[in-house]
Design a protein with these regions (language model features):
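Signature of Gram-negative outer-membrane beta-barrel scaffolds
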Residues: 168-269, 280, 398
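Transmembrane beta-barrel wall of Gram-negative outer-membrane proteins
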Residues: 7-32, 46-83, 99-118, 159-160
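Transmembrane beta-strands of outer-membrane beta-barrel pores
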Residues: 8-10, 19-21, 32-36, 79-83, ...
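Gram-negative outer-membrane beta-barrel transporters
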Residues: 331-334, 353-442
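Outer membrane beta-barrel strand-and-loop segments of large Gram-negative receptors
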Residues: 148-152, 194, 202-204, 300-304, ...
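Surface-exposed extracellular loop regions of Gram-negative outer-membrane beta-barrel proteins
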Residues: 128, 175-187, 229-238, 262, ...
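Flexible loop and strand-edge segments within Gram-negative outer membrane beta-barrel domains
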Residues: 70-148, 180, 186, 190-193, ...
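C-terminal beta-signal and adjacent terminal beta-strands/loops
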Residues: 425, 434-451, 468-470, 476-536
């Protein structure tokens, strides 16, 4: 069986069928966008943005084999890549950002009885991120990635219809490449002697019970025991002895979680949750640039695991025989052991090493309200979702100890979708999204002293990028089904009003009037901001 589609921006194809009748089957699917190909005629060699573009492709495959009535094997794989490139000859700048994931998994399902089920998995995953930038006689390449080897076993036991018990264990071996850099400035070339890597072991045991205590009250209680060990060499400064020493540490924690649902009546209920969580892998991001240069850093002796407490409570109501669903939910999350780059530190300054001098440690919180209205029945269906939230950070060594918004703080997030069945053959659809822009830190001035560039910044995350919003509309025509062939035609317009949503902002050095950029030697230089948009 084949299923596919050819569009103006992308194409897809899915193949599936039996390998051995009643024994095994397969599915293979792939996608590829070709925005980069379509944009080439509009970006000739005379265009300042020639060489810019974006595309992604992915491939998914899965094979399942029925060993017996109680045993099944599944082998699956995924490979995907996104590639973004930007060039502006007016500023003599070029940026390339390829990234993606690859995973392979082998899964065995076994049914012990009608009450006990087991799922065992072996998983390998590979994440790669690369950032390349070149301007005038300066070049920089940052590479980071994570390889994970994971094995886990999960059990599901259902003694009766009111009680479901889950328990299991998992282990992951991590290999980090948190940030390796190569570069060139004029005739000076920087090449590390070797690729810098870190290694760690992470394991967990868990148990949870989902039980209906009464017809009105349902409770889910769980407990997770987690452990983490950093097994690679890492150096930290001993400020008393004024020297760097190798140090490692093991972390072990208990993570409880509790959720409940209480039915007030057949159409309304209250839901609540409390969770504790330890995160052993940190996202180290810098707000000094809005480029996607975030790096993943493992916990160690000098970098403790991130800890969070989260509370949530919500009211849910269905109306008109479940035609409408409504919900309002509030949450509060408190976090400790967060990391941020110190003032003036960029990811490229800390690649090929892992000194604690690069990071500051602090706290944060996140809270908000989520609203949902959904229509499930009738010719016209859809939903409206809105989130009002705030996420802040507190660091003694950052922003003079004053509270500042997190890089990914999103004050407003709105989604509206609608689908209308015009007839048996025609379906109309639309999607509108709006989101507050990311917070970034702007450079106010740069000084060129002895060939080195020094930068002064505004307050941390004191500037908001423009909000992201767009409207998509579409129409799908499905002709009468033929004997062996089913087809449909989809007509859609992406970004109806041609909104230039920001992807990132970069800053170019602007020489004083009458001076060529490549001739800047000493003095003050004014950084000028440029916004880059993928679409339109």
């Amino acid at each position: 069986q084949a299923d596919g589609g050819i569009g103006l921006l992308s194409s897809r194809l899915t193949l599936q069928g039996p390998v051995q009748k009643n024994k095994s089957s397969f599915i293979l699917s792939g996608r590829r966008t070709y925005v980069d190909v379509l944009s080439k005629p509009f970006l000739n060699e005379d265009n300042a943005f020639s060489g810019s573009g974006y595309y992604f492709y992915d491939l998914t495959t899965k094979i399942n084999y029925r060993i017996s009535d109680k045993d099944r094997l599944y082998l699956s794989g995924y490979f995907g890549r996104d590639v973004f490139s930007f060039a502006n000859s007016d500023n003599d700048i070029g940026i390339g950002i390829p990234w993606g994931n690859a995973t392979t998994s082998l899964r065995w399902n076994h049914l012990f009885s009608d009450k006990l089920f087991m799922n065992t998995s072996l998983i390998f995953s590979d994440y790669r991120f690369e950032f390349n930038i070149a301007q005038s006689d300066f070049e920089l390449k940052i590479f980071s990635g994570i390889n994970d080897w994971n094995t886990k076993v999960d059990f599901l036991y259902q003694p009766n219809q009111r009680n479901t018990i889950k328990f299991g264990a998992n282990y992951t071996y991590h290999e980090f490449t948190p940030g390796n850099a190569t570069g060139r400035s004029g005739e000076v070339v920087f090449e590390p002697d070797e690729i810098y890597r870190q290694y760690s072991n992470e394991g967990a045991l868990y148990f949870s019970d989902d039980i209906e205590i009464t017809d009105a009250l349902k409770v889910h209680a769980g407990l997770r025991y987690s452990s983490f060990q950093h097994s690679g060499y890492i150096s930290f400064r001993d400020y008393i002895k004024n020297e760097f020493t190798a140090s490692q540490d093991n972390y072990r924690h208990i993570e409880p979680r509790l959720t409940f649902r209480y039915k007030l009546n057949p159409t309304s209920s209250i839901k609540g949750a409390y969770t504790q969580n330890y995160q052993y892998i940190h996202l180290a991001s810098t707000s000094a640039v809005s480029l996607p240069t975030d790096l993943w850093i493992p916990s160690s002796s000098g970098i403790e695991p991130k800890f969070s407490d989260q509370f949530a409570i919500g009211y849910f109501k269905n109306l008109k025989d479940n035609m409408y669903e409504t919900a309002i939910e509030g949450y509060y999350k408190e976090m400790t052991n967060l990391i941020e780059y110190k003032e003036g530190i960029l990811p490229e300054d800390n690649t090929n090493s892992n000194s604690d001098d690069a990071f500051a440690f602090g706290e944060g919180d996140s809270y908000g309200i989520e609203l949902l209205i959904k229509k499930n029945k009738g010719k016209t269906t859809g939903w409206i979702g809105y989130t009002l939230s705030k996420t802040t950070r507190y660091f003694d060594e950052v922003n003079n100890g004053i509270e500042f918004p997190a890089k990914y703080d999103r004050r407003h997030d709105l989604s509206i979708t609608a689908t209308h069945n015009l007839s048996k053959k025609w379906v109309l659809s639309s999607v509108f999204v709006y989101a507050t822009g990311n917070s970034i830190t702007l450079p106010t001035e740069r000084y060129v002293i002895a060939g080195n560039v020094y930068t002064e910044y505004t307050s941390r995350n004191g500037f908001r990028m423009e909000p992201y919003h767009r409207l998509d509309i579409g129409a799908t025509y499905t002709p009468k089904k033929k004997r062996k062939f089913q087809s449909s035609w989809n007509f859609s317009i992406y970004n109806v009003y041609s909104r230039k949503n920001p992807y990132f902002i970069y800053f170019a050095l602007e020489a004083p009037e009458g001076v060529d950029n490549g001739s800047i030697q000493e003095g003050n230089v004014t950084p000028k901001a440029y916004q880059v948009s993928i679409f339109p």
